Amino acid sequence: MAEYLASIFGTEKDKVNCSFYFKIGACRHGDRCSRLHNKPTFSQTIVLLNLYRNPQNTAQTADGSHCHVSDVEVQEHYDNFFEEVFTELQEKYGEIEEMNVCDNLGDHLVGNVYVKFRREEDAERAVVELNNRWFNGQAVHAELSPVTDFRESCCRQYEMGECTRGGFCNFMHLRPISRDLRRQLYGRGPRRRSPPRSHTGHRPRERNRRRSPDHRHGRF
């Protein structure tokens, strides 16, 4: 019996533990979920909840109407955000194997930043210290995440451009970084497994480009 329970732990057959929380580190039901959310006591991965704000979702004019932000501007804003968060966390806490940002719209996933460190102790220290910090005018909410294999967490239909659930899909829609930034960040140290897929639809990113004033205030 014990072997059977262990074999179904975190799967759809498990009637006690939430399979979505086990795979994705988040569940749309939150505390109201009928199944248990077993938060890890140690993990290589942390999640910074709702940290990234897509300007296409938040840009408004003074009268409350939405203003247009081009895809190129959004990618540049995102690359700046990704580079700053990745660089600062790696410099302060230790080597990062992988960092991913959700582009979903559901409250439990929107703007979540998942950072997988090489060492569990680095992840633990990051959670403790980051929960006392602010970023871009908002308090940082960090916790250890059960996610270690993002291949199990991602929406395969989204990656093929076929997801019919849109931004409210319950699997991760990971926003890609530009190819140039990927080489810049993941080429600094030993080759890491499964870095974020590069975005090839925009012009190459210039290194050391001047950041916008709003972005300079985003530091932890």
UniProtKB/Swiss-Prot annotation:
UniProt-listed GO biological process terms: mRNA splicing, via spliceosome
Superkingdom, natural source: Eukaryota
InterPro entries in alphabetical order: Nucleotide-bd_a/b_plait_sf (IPR012677), RBD_domain_sf (IPR035979), RRM_dom (IPR000504), RRM_dom_euk (IPR003954), U2AF_small (IPR009145), Znf_CCCH (IPR000571)
Zinc finger (C3H1-type): 12-40, 149-176
Residue ranges of every copy of the RRM domain listed in the record: 65-147
Keyword Lipoprotein applies: no
Pfam families with a match to the protein in the record: RRM_1, zf-CCCH
Entry protein name: Splicing factor U2AF 26 kDa subunit
Gene: U2AF1L4
